[in-house]
C-alpha cells in the first residue's frame, strides 16, 4: 500500500499548491511547522546527517536564525518515523488543518476531494510497524542487510512480526543505498567509475520520482472523474438539470408558437390568436384573484 500512500501524498502536495492565497485563514506557526517537519521527514528521512542545527556562527539575522531553528526542531521531532508513516501523518495533518482554516468554497472543495481520496486507502494501508524496514546506513556489507534485519527483529522483540513485501519505490531506495555503501567501501575504484555510478543513481531516482508523479496524475484523473460523477448524481444536480430542461422546453414552445401565430396572421386566420388571447386573459384573472390587491 506504500504506492497508494505515495500517490495520495503527491495529491496532497498539489492540493497545497492550489489553495487560494486570498480569503482563507492562515494556520498558526505550530501547525505550519508540524506540516513542514512531516514533509521533510517524508522526503529526506531523519535530519541527522542531512543538516546541523543552525547556530549564530552561520551569520544569519536573529529573526531568520530563530525561524531556521524552529524548522530544524520541527523536523527533528519526527525523527525515527519511516517515510511512508510520515506521509500518512502529513496527509492526515493537512486534512485536519484545512478543515479548521480553509473557509473559502474552493479550499473546502479541495479538502473534500483530498479526504475522499484518502478515505479510500487509509483503512487498507499498513501502519508504520508493518512498513518495510529502512536500510541501515552503518558501514559494512550493504548487500546482506535485507537478510539480517528480520533476524534482528525476531531476536530483539520476541514474536515474529509480519513483514510486507517492499514496494517498487522502497526497492529503488534500497538499490540506491546499496550503491552508496559500495562506493564508500571500494576506495580503490577509479574516479570515472564512481562518477558513472553516481550519475546512474541520479537517473534511477529521477525515474522513480517520474513514475510516482505519473501514477499520482493517473490517480488524480480517475479521482476527478469519480468526484464529478458523484456530484452529478446528487439531488441538487438533478433539480438543476430538471429546471434547465423545463426552461429549454418552455422557450422552444414559445418560439414555435410565435412562428405559428405570425404565419396564421399572414394568412388572416385569427383562430389560434383568439385562443392565445383567451388563455392570457384567464391567466391574468387567476393571478389577480390569487395575489393580494395593492389597495
From Swiss-Prot:
**Known glycosylation sites:** 136
Q: Which UniProt keywords apply?
A: Autophagy, Glycoprotein, Lipid-binding, Membrane, Peroxisome, Protein transport, Transmembrane, Transmembrane helix, Transport
According to the entry, every stretch annotated as the ACB domain falls at 5-103
Question: What InterPro entries does the annotation carry?
Answer: Acyl-CoA-binding_protein, Acyl-CoA-binding_sf, FERM/acyl-CoA-bd_prot_sf
Q: Which GO terms describe its biological process?
A: autophagy; fatty acid metabolic process; protein transport
Q: Name one Pfam family in it.
A: ACBP
Disruption phenotype annotation: Does not significantly decrease the growth rate under nutrient-rich conditions.
Transmembrane stretches, start-end? 244-264
Query: Which top-rank group of organisms is this from?
Result: Eukaryota
Q: Does the keyword Transmembrane apply?
A: yes
Q: Where is the composition biased (Low complexity)?
A: 125-153
Q: Which Gene Ontology molecular function entries are recorded, alphabetically?
A: fatty-acyl-CoA binding
What are the coiled-coil residue ranges?
none
Segments for region (Disordered): 124-162, 174-201
The principal location of this protein is membrane
Which PROSITE patterns does this UniProt record tie to the protein? ACB_2 (PS51228)
Q: Does the record carry Heme as a key word?
A: no
Cell compartment(s), UniProt:
Peroxisome membrane
Q: What does this protein do?
A: Acyl-CoA binding protein which acts as the peroxisome receptor for pexophagy. Required for both micropexophagy and macropexophagy, but not for the cytoplasm to vacuole transport (Cvt) or autophagy pathways. Required for functional micropexophagic apparatus (MIPA) and relocation of ATG11 to the peroxisome-sequestering arms of the vacuole. Binds palmitoyl-CoA but not oleyl-CoA.
Q: Which family does it belong to?
A: Belongs to the ATG37 family.
Q: What is this protein called?
A: Autophagy-related protein 37
Give the classification, highest ranks: Eukaryota, Fungi, Dikarya, Ascomycota, Pezizomycotina
